[in-house]
């Protein structure tokens, strides 16, 4: 089951208030390099010969994999993960199950519009414009996100910015479970009539693109470290995200996975 799909609340068991804390981590300038990145022997990275992440949920052995976003305008992406990580539909790689202690994730997004207010998202959407700076400005202006100042970065030869967004740690939310997955119902936010819960939403994906149709957040205190990159005129957002329950080891693994990213040009 894709970790970023929200199931109707009526199908799940509502109940426990989410317990949260604050993150004090600050973004640092990104200078990705092979040193320090997870780099196991590729011969042990998968039980199959395929290195391309595909549809569905795929358990991953340690190694380097290929992300094909299905867009000729974008290069394929190499990403190296530790043992025990999982791929969801080829555009999300994660460790653990959302809202459990070891959960972290990296997502790839083709962002279209930004919600004017992430909690009261029925107020409308903003079309930020096509550039890296346009999107960074729109996200920095979004209420309740405590956005950091965008920092210039270069990732495998491509320029962009890094910034962090967060969800207020004291935002009331109730968790509900379905199978192995745990979701957040943000009590003060607008209700999603399709899903049935109250959502905290950041942006929408370009219609018809890979991946998710909208970026909703998984819980109070969640942090998203964003790389907004210009790939020869095409914008790509890479979102490394974690929750307050994530420990330092798992956050360290998350940053190593991000720093392993290379583009096949």
Residue ranges and their predicted role:
Residues 2-119, 209-213, 218-220, 230-265:
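N-terminal targeting sequences that direct proteins away from the cytosol to non-cytosolic compartments
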Residues 52-53, 90-231, 237:
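Conserved polar/disulfide-associated segments of primarily extracytoplasmic proteins
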């Amino acid at each position: 089951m894709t970790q970023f799909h929200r199931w109707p609340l009526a199908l799940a068991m509502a109940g426990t208030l989410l317990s949260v804390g604050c993150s004090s981590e600050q973004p640092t300038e990104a200078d990705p390099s092979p040193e320090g990145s997870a780099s196991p022997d590729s011969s042990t990275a998968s039980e199959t010969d395929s290195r391309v992440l595909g549809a569905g949920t795929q358990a991953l052995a340690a190694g380097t994999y290929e992300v094909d976003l299905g867009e000729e305008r974008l290069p394929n992406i190499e990403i190296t993960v530790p043992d025990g990580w999982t791929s969801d539909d080829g555009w999300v790689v994660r460790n653990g199950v959302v809202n459990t202690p070891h959960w972290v994730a990296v997502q790839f997004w083709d962002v279209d519009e930004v919600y004017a207010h992430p909690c009261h998202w029925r107020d409308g959407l903003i079309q930020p414009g096509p550039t890296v700076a346009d999107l960074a400005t729109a996200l920095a202006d979004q209420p309740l996100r405590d956005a950091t100042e965008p920092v210039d970065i270069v990732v495998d030869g491509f320029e962009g910015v890094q910034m962090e967004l967060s969800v207020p740690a004291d935002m009331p939310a109730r968790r509900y479970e379905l199978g192995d997955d745990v979701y957040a119902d943000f009590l003060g936010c607008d209700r999603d009539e399709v899903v049935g819960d109250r959502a905290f939403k950041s942006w929408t994906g370009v219609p018809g693109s890979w991946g998710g149709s909208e970026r909703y957040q998984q819980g109070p205190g969640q942090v998203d470290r964003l790389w907004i990159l210009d790939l020869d005129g095409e914008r790509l957002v890479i979102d490394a995200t974690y929750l307050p329950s994530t420990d330092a080891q798992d956050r360290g693994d998350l940053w190593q996975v991000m720093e392993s990213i290379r583009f096949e040009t």
